[in-house]
Structures are given as structure tokens and as C-alpha cells.
């Protein structure tokens, strides 16, 4: 029986020499791989009390939407700046070479709501830290951060240590 890890393609030396790129597209382009990935992520939410799934653009949408659908929960988009039409809250965070800004609609999370943040991959944790701060600014509580893949060598869990962080597959390197 195949595991999610069996569906993840590894591309050496991309985007630069010494990096082992973990390609999630090989998971979602295979019907069995996609179903297994979503099922494994849903299992990690079993018994958890939460109200909303929020996903980070763009692959957090890919995994968050089917989870929200399967569990009959609303889905909230965490988008790059300038992509949402209504009033937003925003957070700028550091990248390796510069900064990025993400936004959420001001009415997307209600005070007291329990939120699960979803993305395809955790590396340094910067995007999810910013997303969590947006949820908290809106009065929500982040009860879990859920990823398909973790690049443990980049220490994202350390940045997110105050949260419940879970990943289906973990790789030691970068």
C-alpha cells in the first residue's frame, strides 16, 4: 500500500544546488495520491473542536478546500496583498530576500472562532506565523496548523512553537 511520501516527487538541485525540492504537484496530479493526502490530513483533525479552515494562497487552497468540504466547515482564504475585494487586515513578514504581505477579509473570522490553518508545506514558518497573527487580530484562536509536508531542517516548528503543528510527511533536510 502506498503512502503519501510515495507520491511526493523529489527534484535534486532545484531551485539551486544542494536543495532537494519536494514537489507536491505529483501528489495532486494523481487521483489516488490526492485522495490519500486529503484523507491523511483529515485524520489529523479527528476529535478536534474547530469552526473554520483557513488556507494560505495558493496550495493551502488546494488542500484546505476539500478538507473544509468533507468536514462541512467554512473555508477562509489567506491571500497575497491586493487580491481580496472587501475590507481586509494585512500582515507583512520577512522572506529570505525581502518581504511579503498577506491579507484576510475583516469579516472572515469571527471573535471566538477556532481556526485550523492549512498549507501544503512548512519550511521556515513565516507565512503561517503571519496568518496566525491575522486570525488572532480578528479575535479567532488558532487551534492547529496542518501541513502535508514539513521540511524539518528549516526549523519552522520553532517559530510556531506556541501552536499545535502537524504534518503528514516530514523530511529532515531543506
UniProtKB/Swiss-Prot annotation:
Keyword DNA-binding listed: no
Origin: domain of life: Bacteria
Pfam families in the cross-refs: Pribosyltran
The protein's enzyme class: transferase
Compartments, as annotated in UniProt: Cytoplasm
GO biological process, alphabetically ordered: adenine salvage; AMP salvage; purine ribonucleoside salvage
Catalytic reaction list: AMP + diphosphate = 5-phospho-alpha-D-ribose 1-diphosphate + adenine
Pathway of action: Purine metabolism; AMP biosynthesis via salvage pathway; AMP from adenine: step 1/1
Matching Gene3D superfamilies: 3.40.50.2020
Enzyme Commission code: 2.4.2.7
A GO CC term assigned to this protein in UniProt: cytoplasm
Alphabetized SUPFAM superfamilies for the sequence: PRTase-like (SSF53271)
Annotated function: Catalyzes a salvage reaction resulting in the formation of AMP, that is energically less costly than de novo synthesis.
Homology family: Belongs to the purine/pyrimidine phosphoribosyltransferase family.
Assembly mode: Homodimer.
The protein's name in its UniProt record: Adenine phosphoribosyltransferase
Native organism: Agathobacter rectalis (strain ATCC 33656 / DSM 3377 / JCM 17463 / KCTC 5835 / VPI 0990)
Lineage of the organism: Bacteria, Bacillati, Bacillota, Clostridia, Lachnospirales
Gene this chain is encoded by: apt
